[in-house]
A protein has these predicted regions:
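N-terminal functional module of multi-domain proteins
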Residues: 62-64
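Short Pro-Cys-Gly-centered "Cys-loop" motif that presents a nucleophilic cysteine in a tight turn
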Residues: 1-57, 66-166
Length: 166
């Protein structure tokens, strides 16, 4: 059975989710997270994708992403980051096989009120998982940059419906 084609909406943001195969960890230590963030930066520049929010958990990742250059740029971004991380991770931990479960999921987010809730949902993921008590205490999300002004070379900024959020 063929895969369902991705929907591309020009000037829309997407909630992207990629999970480890069988919910296995895709990050085991801080250097794995840092490497993944470097890959995001590299492929963001290469493809022109914009990252408005992110959270890297041990076994999955979330992004709010915009792809001004179409579906191919978004796919190139996710493939480049995912494949590069998998090759490094598998080599580092002497493992073989797929690191990521299936292909990444993408959900179109058209309305600003939905995006505002999505920012909170993504950045509070480590709070819901009881890893930290506040999102700003988690080192692998965009909360500190977006809400507290900490420098983050990965993040782009978007203003939502005059809220100043984003």
């Amino acid at each position: 059975m063929p895969r369902t084609a991705r929907v591309f909406v020009e000037n829309a943001c997407y909630h992207i989710v990629a999970r480890g195969v069988q919910n296995d960890d895709v990050f085991r230590n801080p250097s794995d997270f840092r490497n993944y963030l470097r890959l995001i930066h590299k492929y963001k520049i290469k493809t022109g994708c914009r990252i408005y929010c992110y959270c890297l958990m041990d076994n999955h990742v979330h992004f709010i992403l915009e792809s001004p250059f179409g579906l191919k740029a978004m796919s190139t971004f996710m493939h480049g980051v995912g494949m590069s991380h998998a090759l490094r991770f598998n080599g580092k931990y002497n493992r073989t096989g797929h690191l990521w479960q299936n292909r990444y999921k993408s959900f179109v987010a058209l309305k600003d009120d939905y995006l505002i809730n999505l920012f909170s949902y993504i950045e509070h993921n480590p709070v819901r998982a009881k890893i930290v008590s506040k999102p700003e205490d988690y080192p692998w999300n965009s909360y500190k940059a977006r809400m507290l002004g900490k420098k983050d070379i990965i993040l782009d900024y978007i203003t939502l419906a005059g809220t100043g959020v984003g």
